[in-house]
Protein backbone atom coordinates (compact mmCIF):
# COMPACT_ATOMS: atom_id res chain seq x y z
CA UNK A 1 0.00 0.00 0.00
CA UNK A 2 1.35 3.41 -0.95
CA UNK A 3 1.94 5.92 1.81
CA UNK A 4 -0.22 9.03 1.28
CA UNK A 5 2.45 11.16 2.89
CA UNK A 6 5.02 9.68 0.55
CA UNK A 7 2.83 10.47 -2.46
CA UNK A 8 2.92 14.16 -1.49
CA UNK A 9 6.56 14.00 -0.43
CA UNK A 10 5.96 15.24 3.13
CA UNK A 11 6.69 13.87 6.60
CA UNK A 12 4.01 12.16 8.67
CA UNK A 13 3.99 15.09 11.08
CA UNK A 14 3.70 17.72 8.29
CA UNK A 15 1.45 20.67 8.97
CA UNK A 16 -1.64 21.47 6.90
CA UNK A 17 0.23 24.34 5.23
CA UNK A 18 3.12 22.04 4.28
CA UNK A 19 0.69 19.51 2.83
CA UNK A 20 -1.11 22.24 0.89
CA UNK A 21 2.13 23.67 -0.54
CA UNK A 22 3.29 20.20 -1.58
CA UNK A 23 -0.02 19.53 -3.31
CA UNK A 24 -0.02 22.85 -5.19
CA UNK A 25 3.51 22.22 -6.44
CA UNK A 26 2.77 18.66 -7.59
CA UNK A 27 -0.61 19.60 -9.08
CA UNK A 28 0.96 22.21 -11.33
CA UNK A 29 3.72 19.81 -12.34
CA UNK A 30 1.47 16.81 -13.01
CA UNK A 31 -1.66 18.50 -14.39
CA UNK A 32 -2.93 16.34 -17.33
CA UNK A 33 -3.26 19.36 -19.61
CA UNK A 34 0.43 20.11 -19.10
CA UNK A 35 1.75 16.58 -18.62
CA UNK A 36 -0.72 14.07 -20.19
CA UNK A 37 1.39 11.03 -19.22
CA UNK A 38 1.03 11.83 -15.51
CA UNK A 39 -2.77 11.56 -15.23
CA UNK A 40 -2.61 8.61 -12.81
CA UNK A 41 -0.03 10.30 -10.59
CA UNK A 42 -2.08 13.49 -10.59
CA UNK A 43 -5.13 11.56 -9.46
CA UNK A 44 -3.15 9.87 -6.67
CA UNK A 45 -1.76 13.23 -5.51
CA UNK A 46 -5.27 14.72 -5.46
CA UNK A 47 -6.58 11.74 -3.47
CA UNK A 48 -3.76 12.00 -0.96
CA UNK A 49 -4.28 15.74 -0.51
CA UNK A 50 -8.04 15.46 -0.02
CA UNK A 51 -7.52 12.99 2.82
CA UNK A 52 -4.54 14.58 4.55
CA UNK A 53 -5.90 18.14 4.34
CA UNK A 54 -8.99 17.21 6.32
CA UNK A 55 -8.31 16.66 10.05
CA UNK A 56 -11.00 14.00 10.54
CA UNK A 57 -10.09 12.02 7.42
CA UNK A 58 -6.38 12.32 8.21
CA UNK A 59 -6.94 11.05 11.74
CA UNK A 60 -8.94 8.12 10.39
CA UNK A 61 -6.22 7.29 7.87
CA UNK A 62 -3.44 7.55 10.47
CA UNK A 63 -5.41 5.30 12.82
CA UNK A 64 -5.77 2.61 10.14
CA UNK A 65 -2.11 2.86 9.18
CA UNK A 66 -0.82 2.67 12.73
CA UNK A 67 -3.23 -0.09 13.71
CA UNK A 68 -2.82 -2.13 10.56
CA UNK A 69 -5.47 -3.15 8.06
CA UNK A 70 -7.63 -6.19 8.48
CA UNK A 71 -7.66 -8.80 5.75
CA UNK A 72 -11.04 -7.65 4.45
CA UNK A 73 -10.21 -3.91 4.52
CA UNK A 74 -10.40 -2.33 1.08
CA UNK A 75 -8.40 0.87 0.73
CA UNK A 76 -10.19 1.71 -2.52
CA UNK A 77 -13.49 1.77 -0.60
CA UNK A 78 -11.95 4.24 1.82
CA UNK A 79 -10.77 6.41 -1.06
CA UNK A 80 -14.14 6.15 -2.78
CA UNK A 81 -15.96 7.44 0.28
CA UNK A 82 -13.62 10.41 0.41
CA UNK A 83 -13.62 11.42 -3.22
CA UNK A 84 -17.06 10.79 -4.64
CA UNK A 85 -18.13 14.27 -3.61
CA UNK A 86 -15.03 16.31 -4.37
CA UNK A 87 -13.56 14.77 -7.52
CA UNK A 88 -16.38 15.47 -9.95
CA UNK A 89 -16.39 19.26 -9.71
CA UNK A 90 -12.68 19.34 -10.55
CA UNK A 91 -13.18 17.53 -13.85
CA UNK A 92 -13.66 19.48 -17.08
CA UNK A 93 -16.91 19.25 -19.01
CA UNK A 94 -17.41 16.87 -21.93
CA UNK A 95 -17.60 17.95 -25.57
CA UNK A 96 -19.70 16.59 -28.44
CA UNK A 97 -18.80 16.89 -32.13
CA UNK A 98 -20.52 15.51 -35.25
CA UNK A 99 -18.50 14.21 -38.19
CA UNK A 100 -19.34 12.90 -41.67
CA UNK A 101 -17.40 9.78 -42.68
CA UNK A 102 -17.03 8.38 -46.18
CA UNK A 103 -18.16 4.79 -46.68
CA UNK A 104 -14.66 3.38 -47.23
CA UNK A 105 -13.37 4.80 -43.94
CA UNK A 106 -16.49 3.62 -42.12
CA UNK A 107 -15.95 0.06 -43.36
CA UNK A 108 -12.17 -0.33 -43.14
CA UNK A 109 -11.32 2.28 -40.50
CA UNK A 110 -8.99 5.25 -40.68
CA UNK A 111 -8.46 8.65 -39.14
CA UNK A 112 -10.00 12.06 -39.59
CA UNK A 113 -8.93 15.47 -38.31
CA UNK A 114 -11.64 17.74 -36.90
CA UNK A 115 -11.34 21.29 -35.62
CA UNK A 116 -13.03 22.04 -32.31
CA UNK A 117 -13.23 24.98 -29.94
CA UNK A 118 -12.59 23.89 -26.37
CA UNK A 119 -11.28 25.14 -23.06
CA UNK A 120 -7.52 24.69 -22.70
CA UNK A 121 -5.17 25.53 -19.85
CA UNK A 122 -4.28 29.23 -19.96
CA UNK A 123 -0.79 29.68 -21.42
CA UNK A 124 -0.14 32.77 -19.29
CA UNK A 125 -0.98 31.57 -15.78
CA UNK A 126 -0.60 27.81 -16.52
CA UNK A 127 -3.93 27.15 -14.84
CA UNK A 128 -3.09 28.92 -11.57
CA UNK A 129 -5.72 31.60 -12.39
CA UNK A 130 -3.47 34.29 -10.89
CA UNK A 131 -1.57 36.99 -12.73
CA UNK A 132 2.13 36.03 -13.11
CA UNK A 133 4.04 37.15 -10.03
CA UNK A 134 1.10 36.58 -7.71
CA UNK A 135 -0.04 33.50 -5.85
CA UNK A 136 -3.46 32.27 -4.89
CA UNK A 137 -4.43 32.45 -1.24
CA UNK A 138 -6.28 29.83 0.76
CA UNK A 139 -10.07 30.13 0.62
CA UNK A 140 -11.37 31.24 4.01
CA UNK A 141 -14.70 29.43 3.70
CA UNK A 142 -13.35 25.92 3.10
CA UNK A 143 -9.77 26.30 4.39
CA UNK A 144 -8.44 25.18 1.03
CA UNK A 145 -10.25 21.85 0.87
CA UNK A 146 -12.70 22.92 -1.85
CA UNK A 147 -15.64 21.47 0.06
CA UNK A 148 -17.81 22.68 2.91
CA UNK A 149 -18.88 20.04 5.40
CA UNK A 150 -22.10 20.02 7.32
CA UNK A 151 -24.18 17.78 9.54
CA UNK A 152 -27.73 16.63 8.84
CA UNK A 153 -29.92 14.96 11.42
CA UNK A 154 -31.96 12.01 10.17
CA UNK A 155 -33.94 9.19 11.73
CA UNK A 156 -30.86 7.02 11.23
CA UNK A 157 -28.63 9.45 13.07
CA UNK A 158 -26.44 12.37 12.13
CA UNK A 159 -24.98 12.32 8.61
CA UNK A 160 -21.92 14.27 7.53
CA UNK A 161 -22.41 16.01 4.17
CA UNK A 162 -19.87 17.51 1.77
CA UNK A 163 -20.73 20.18 -0.76
CA UNK A 164 -18.64 22.12 -3.22
CA UNK A 165 -17.53 25.41 -1.73
CA UNK A 166 -19.58 28.16 -3.36
CA UNK A 167 -16.94 30.80 -2.66
CA UNK A 168 -14.03 29.19 -4.52
CA UNK A 169 -16.13 26.81 -6.68
CA UNK A 170 -14.19 23.85 -5.34
CA UNK A 171 -10.69 25.12 -6.09
CA UNK A 172 -9.74 25.79 -2.49
CA UNK A 173 -8.12 29.09 -3.49
CA UNK A 174 -8.87 32.77 -3.26
CA UNK A 175 -7.70 34.75 -6.32
CA UNK A 176 -6.89 38.34 -5.40
CA UNK A 177 -5.08 39.14 -8.68
CA UNK A 178 -6.84 37.21 -11.46
CA UNK A 179 -5.00 36.47 -14.70
CA UNK A 180 -5.82 39.06 -17.35
CA UNK A 181 -5.66 36.53 -20.17
CA UNK A 182 -8.20 34.04 -18.80
CA UNK A 183 -9.92 36.42 -16.33
CA UNK A 184 -9.06 34.15 -13.43
CA UNK A 185 -10.64 31.02 -14.89
CA UNK A 186 -7.38 29.12 -15.42
CA UNK A 187 -8.52 28.15 -18.90
CA UNK A 188 -9.54 29.85 -22.12
CA UNK A 189 -11.32 28.94 -25.33
CA UNK A 190 -9.05 28.01 -28.22
CA UNK A 191 -9.36 26.06 -31.50
CA UNK A 192 -7.73 22.63 -31.62
CA UNK A 193 -7.16 20.06 -34.34
CA UNK A 194 -8.10 16.62 -33.01
CA UNK A 195 -7.27 13.40 -34.87
CA UNK A 196 -10.18 10.96 -34.58
CA UNK A 197 -9.22 7.29 -34.94
CA UNK A 198 -12.19 5.58 -36.59
CA UNK A 199 -12.46 1.81 -36.01
CA UNK A 200 -13.56 -0.52 -38.84
CA UNK A 201 -17.30 -1.13 -39.03
CA UNK A 202 -18.63 2.26 -37.91
CA UNK A 203 -22.26 2.99 -38.80
CA UNK A 204 -24.42 6.11 -38.71
CA UNK A 205 -25.51 6.89 -35.15
CA UNK A 206 -22.49 5.34 -33.46
CA UNK A 207 -20.62 7.41 -30.87
CA UNK A 208 -16.86 7.32 -30.29
CA UNK A 209 -15.48 8.33 -26.88
CA UNK A 210 -12.04 9.95 -26.65
CA UNK A 211 -11.01 10.23 -22.98
CA UNK A 212 -9.48 13.45 -21.62
CA UNK A 213 -9.91 15.44 -24.84
CA UNK A 214 -12.79 17.61 -23.65
CA UNK A 215 -12.69 20.93 -21.84
CA UNK A 216 -9.91 21.61 -19.37
CA UNK A 217 -10.91 21.54 -15.71
CA UNK A 218 -9.42 21.98 -12.28
CA UNK A 219 -8.13 18.41 -12.45
CA UNK A 220 -8.83 15.93 -15.25
CA UNK A 221 -10.13 17.26 -18.58
CA UNK A 222 -13.52 16.11 -19.78
CA UNK A 223 -14.06 13.57 -22.56
CA UNK A 224 -14.72 14.18 -26.24
CA UNK A 225 -17.67 12.35 -27.82
CA UNK A 226 -17.85 11.97 -31.59
CA UNK A 227 -21.20 11.20 -33.26
CA UNK A 228 -20.70 9.55 -36.65
CA UNK A 229 -22.71 9.89 -39.84
CA UNK A 230 -21.73 7.78 -42.85
CA UNK A 231 -22.08 9.60 -46.17
CA UNK A 232 -23.80 7.95 -49.13
CA UNK A 233 -21.48 6.51 -51.77
CA UNK A 234 -22.21 7.15 -55.46
CA UNK A 235 -21.71 3.49 -56.42
CA UNK A 236 -21.88 1.27 -53.32
CA UNK A 237 -24.64 0.58 -50.80
CA UNK A 238 -24.08 -1.11 -47.43
CA UNK A 239 -26.73 -3.40 -46.00
CA UNK A 240 -25.55 -5.07 -42.81
CA UNK A 241 -22.32 -6.88 -43.61
CA UNK A 242 -22.89 -6.92 -47.37
CA UNK A 243 -22.02 -4.34 -49.99
CA UNK A 244 -24.15 -3.87 -53.11
CA UNK A 245 -23.33 -2.23 -56.41
CA UNK A 246 -24.85 -2.23 -59.90
CA UNK A 247 -22.85 -3.17 -62.98
CA UNK A 248 -24.01 -2.12 -66.45
CA UNK A 249 -23.25 -4.75 -69.12
CA UNK A 250 -24.11 -5.02 -72.80
CA UNK A 251 -26.55 -7.55 -74.21
CA UNK A 252 -23.66 -9.31 -75.94
CA UNK A 253 -21.72 -9.71 -72.67
CA UNK A 254 -24.87 -10.95 -70.94
CA UNK A 255 -25.41 -13.60 -73.62
CA UNK A 256 -21.82 -14.70 -74.18
CA UNK A 257 -20.29 -13.99 -70.77
CA UNK A 258 -17.10 -12.04 -70.14
CA UNK A 259 -14.52 -11.04 -67.53
CA UNK A 260 -14.29 -7.42 -66.34
CA UNK A 261 -12.35 -5.45 -63.73
CA UNK A 262 -14.11 -3.08 -61.35
CA UNK A 263 -12.80 -0.60 -58.78
CA UNK A 264 -14.20 -1.85 -55.48
CA UNK A 265 -13.72 -0.17 -52.10
CA UNK A 266 -11.09 -2.83 -51.42
CA UNK A 267 -9.15 -2.21 -54.65
CA UNK A 268 -9.35 -3.51 -58.21
CA UNK A 269 -11.35 -6.71 -58.52
CA UNK A 270 -11.76 -9.21 -61.40
CA UNK A 271 -15.38 -10.27 -61.96
CA UNK A 272 -16.52 -13.18 -64.15
CA UNK A 273 -19.92 -12.67 -65.79
CA UNK A 274 -21.44 -16.03 -66.74
CA UNK A 275 -22.95 -16.61 -70.18
CA UNK A 276 -26.72 -16.16 -70.46
CA UNK A 277 -26.82 -13.79 -67.49
CA UNK A 278 -30.21 -12.22 -66.87
CA UNK A 279 -31.03 -8.65 -65.95
CA UNK A 280 -30.82 -8.19 -62.13
CA UNK A 281 -28.83 -11.38 -61.64
CA UNK A 282 -26.57 -11.06 -58.59
CA UNK A 283 -22.92 -12.10 -58.57
CA UNK A 284 -21.82 -12.65 -54.96
CA UNK A 285 -18.12 -12.42 -54.09
CA UNK A 286 -17.33 -13.76 -50.62
CA UNK A 287 -15.40 -11.72 -48.03
CA UNK A 288 -15.33 -8.56 -50.15
CA UNK A 289 -18.11 -6.80 -48.30
CA UNK A 290 -18.26 -4.62 -45.19
CA UNK A 291 -16.27 -5.15 -42.01
CA UNK A 292 -18.18 -5.08 -38.72
CA UNK A 293 -17.07 -3.90 -35.29
CA UNK A 294 -16.95 -7.54 -34.18
CA UNK A 295 -14.50 -8.39 -36.95
CA UNK A 296 -16.75 -10.25 -39.39
CA UNK A 297 -16.79 -9.51 -43.11
CA UNK A 298 -19.66 -9.77 -45.55
CA UNK A 299 -19.91 -10.27 -49.31
CA UNK A 300 -19.83 -7.96 -52.30
CA UNK A 301 -23.06 -8.37 -54.28
CA UNK A 302 -22.93 -7.15 -57.88
CA UNK A 303 -26.36 -6.63 -59.45
CA UNK A 304 -26.26 -6.93 -63.25
CA UNK A 305 -28.04 -4.31 -65.32
CA UNK A 306 -28.28 -5.53 -68.92
CA UNK A 307 -28.34 -2.62 -71.39
CA UNK A 308 -30.45 -3.25 -74.48
CA UNK A 309 -29.56 -1.65 -77.79
CA UNK A 310 -31.35 1.63 -78.39
CA UNK A 311 -31.32 1.29 -82.16
CA UNK A 312 -31.34 -1.59 -84.70
CA UNK A 313 -30.53 -1.30 -88.38
CA UNK A 314 -32.08 -3.72 -90.95
CA UNK A 315 -28.99 -5.91 -90.99
CA UNK A 316 -29.14 -6.47 -87.22
CA UNK A 317 -32.87 -7.20 -87.37
CA UNK A 318 -32.34 -9.85 -90.03
CA UNK A 319 -29.51 -11.41 -88.04
CA UNK A 320 -31.59 -11.63 -84.86
CA UNK A 321 -34.50 -13.27 -86.71
CA UNK A 322 -32.08 -15.77 -88.16
CA UNK A 323 -30.61 -16.59 -84.74
CA UNK A 324 -34.02 -16.78 -83.04
CA UNK A 325 -36.55 -17.79 -85.71
CA UNK A 326 -39.19 -18.85 -83.14
CA UNK A 327 -38.85 -16.69 -79.97
CA UNK A 328 -41.28 -17.37 -77.10
CA UNK A 329 -44.46 -15.32 -77.23
CA UNK A 330 -45.05 -12.62 -74.60
CA UNK A 331 -47.19 -13.74 -71.65
CA UNK A 332 -48.08 -12.55 -68.17
CA UNK A 333 -45.63 -13.60 -65.46
CA UNK A 334 -46.52 -14.32 -61.86
CA UNK A 335 -45.74 -11.58 -59.42
CA UNK A 336 -42.70 -12.24 -57.21
CA UNK A 337 -41.70 -10.78 -53.85
CA UNK A 338 -38.95 -11.02 -51.32
CA UNK A 339 -35.39 -10.60 -52.46
CA UNK A 340 -36.29 -9.45 -55.99
CA UNK A 341 -38.55 -6.70 -54.67
CA UNK A 342 -35.89 -5.61 -52.21
CA UNK A 343 -33.33 -5.28 -54.99
CA UNK A 344 -35.81 -3.39 -57.13
CA UNK A 345 -36.37 -0.85 -54.37
CA UNK A 346 -32.64 -0.45 -53.86
CA UNK A 347 -31.53 -0.06 -57.44
CA UNK A 348 -34.42 1.46 -59.40
Swiss-Prot record:
Keywords: Chaperone, Cytoplasm, DNA replication, Metal-binding, Repeat, Stress response, Zinc, Zinc-finger. Its cofactor is Zn(2+). GO terms for cellular component: cytoplasm. GO terms for biological process: chaperone cofactor-dependent protein refolding; DNA replication; protein refolding; response to heat. Its main location: cytoplasm. InterPro entries: DnaJ, DnaJ_C, DnaJ_domain, DnaJ_domain_CS, HSP40/DnaJ_pept-bd, HSP_DnaJ_Cys-rich_dom, HSP_DnaJ_Cys-rich_dom_sf, J_dom_sf. CXXCXGXG motif repeats lie at residues 122-129, 139-146, 165-172, 179-186. Zn(2+) 1 binds at residues 122, 125, 179, 182. Binds 2 Zn(2+) ions per monomer. It is found in: Cytoplasm. Residues 3-65 form the J domain. Zn(2+) 2 binds at residues 139, 142, 165, 168. One of its GO terms (molecular function) is heat shock protein binding. A zinc finger (CR-type) spans 109-191. Pfam families: DnaJ, DnaJ_C, DnaJ_CXXCXGXG. Homodimer. Participates actively in the response to hyperosmotic and heat shock by preventing the aggregation of stress-denatured proteins and by disaggregating proteins, also in an autonomous, DnaK-independent fashion. Unfolded proteins bind initially to DnaJ; upon interaction with the DnaJ-bound protein, DnaK hydrolyzes its bound ATP, resulting in the formation of a stable complex. GrpE releases ADP from DnaK; ATP binding to DnaK triggers the release of the substrate protein, thus completing the reaction cycle. The J domain is necessary and sufficient to stimulate DnaK ATPase activity. Zinc center 1 plays an important role in the autonomous, DnaK-independent chaperone activity of DnaJ. Zinc center 2 is essential for interaction with DnaK and for DnaJ activity. Belongs to the DnaJ family. This is Chaperone protein DnaJ. It comes from Tropheryma whipplei (strain TW08/27). The gene is dnaJ.
Amino acid sequence: MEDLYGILGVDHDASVDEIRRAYRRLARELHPDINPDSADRFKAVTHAYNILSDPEQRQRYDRHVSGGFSSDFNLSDLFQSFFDTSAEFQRGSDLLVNIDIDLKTAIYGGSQVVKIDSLVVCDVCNGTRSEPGYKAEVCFDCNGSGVVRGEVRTTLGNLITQNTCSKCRGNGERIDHPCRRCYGNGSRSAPRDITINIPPGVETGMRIKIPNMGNAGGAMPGDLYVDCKVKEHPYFLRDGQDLYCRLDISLVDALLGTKVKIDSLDGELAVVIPALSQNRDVIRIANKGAVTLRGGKGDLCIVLNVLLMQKLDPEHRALLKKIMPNPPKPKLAKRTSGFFSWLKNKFT
